[in-house]
Amino acid sequence: MSDAIKHECGIAMIRLRKPLEYYIGKYGTSLYGINKLQLLMEKQHNRGQDGAGMACVKFDMPPGTRYINRLRSNAASPIKDLFNNINQQFENISRQNPKRIMDVQWMKYHAEFTGELFLGHLRYGTFGKNDIRNLHPVMRVNNWKTKNLVLAGNFNLTNVDELFEKLVAYGQYPIETSDTVTILEKIGHFLDDENEALYARFKGEGYQKSEITDHIIEHLDLLAILENSSKYWDGGFAIAGMLGHGDAFVMRDPAGIRPAFYYEDEEVVVAASERPVIQTTFNLKTEDVKEIEPGHALIIKKSG
């Protein structure tokens, strides 16, 4: 059985499956994704007494522009503080030029958290100081979009020391021994391997360097990366992640210790730690929301 809900962190993920213009036409807002993420997080506020954070990936941004945004808060009311800061930006834009808030291209280039993929986390600290550096999402940054990794989770691994030693055996030199850093670097290691193998393959096939990234995006085997990364993990976990180019995942431990649920339709793919949270946010029936089976992963490709 899992721990009581009050002793667990919470996750929330939203992937928009339509162009942002679609949500303006149907719902009258360019902020549909982040508004829904806020609801998902507020409805899990019991899981986030010690901190909250969220990140967003913008699709198809040109080189030289920021395509991942992240904000975290360890304030007394972290969810409120988090979204007050984010929404203040949108209020300022609306006040200065109301038309811009409905201009998708302008918003993507000039406003943060205006993308297609969102990940939120609520921290209930079981150990470790309530330092903002301990808050999720955590990031592994790289100039290659397909090597960027954003991670958030609800987990408690029991063999962190063993996993840390495996990282050292790979030749890495981690600066922390926490399970968060260990998981981030473990997935990152196999993500790097997959990227490098695909790069060598497509370079050998004669593709130009500038073309190879698109082929890596198309052929990246996220399932294999997760299988290799989690092979020796022992304990409970529900982990959500985003890659810089737009792939995303939610994976769950084989024993089903940590919960995770999802819903999908033609507009969105949504995941969260609690079924009723998804139901009430999207006005769904109980049977509409599916459980991510123990030992399985929900994988969302950038292609949809």
Task: List each language-model region with its residue ranges.
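Conserved short alpha-helical segments that host acidic/polar catalytic motifs at enzyme active sites
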Residues: M1-G304
